Amino acid sequence: MKIIREAMAGTLESSDVMVRIAPAEGPEHDLLIASSVEKQFGEAIRQTLLQVLQHYQVEPVQVMVDDKGALDCVLRARLETALMRACDNGQLPWGAPNENAE
């Protein structure tokens, strides 16, 4: 998936997360995480972001996260929404690829 514009999703309310994405200049994803629970869950947040980016085969992108204690499912949903808003086709390929499809 190619990111062509900046996009964001989420709020700064308690138990939510604001995710902003933009095309990256370098060869790797650039993850910038600010979280009220970073000491406890910083690595889990990073892994969730990387899993979603890998699942959708996103080209190098900058992801800025301002977390206020959001659950994993909220983080995933906010990132998926930001990806949809930033990509050129306007929709995500939901579900896993079906290898047996003809």
UniProtKB/Swiss-Prot annotation:
InterPro entries: CitD (IPR006495), Mal_deCO2ase/Cit_lyase_ACP (IPR023439). The keyword Phosphoprotein applies. The keyword Cell wall biogenesis/degradation does not apply. Signal peptide: none annotated. It comes from the Bacteria. Keywords: Cytoplasm, Phosphoprotein. The modification O-(phosphoribosyl dephospho-coenzyme A)serine is found at S14. Oligomer with a subunit composition of (alpha,beta,gamma)6. Covalent carrier of the coenzyme of citrate lyase. NCBIfam families: citD, PRK13253.1. HAMAP family: CitD (MF_00805). This is Citrate lyase acyl carrier protein. It comes from Serratia proteamaculans (strain 568).
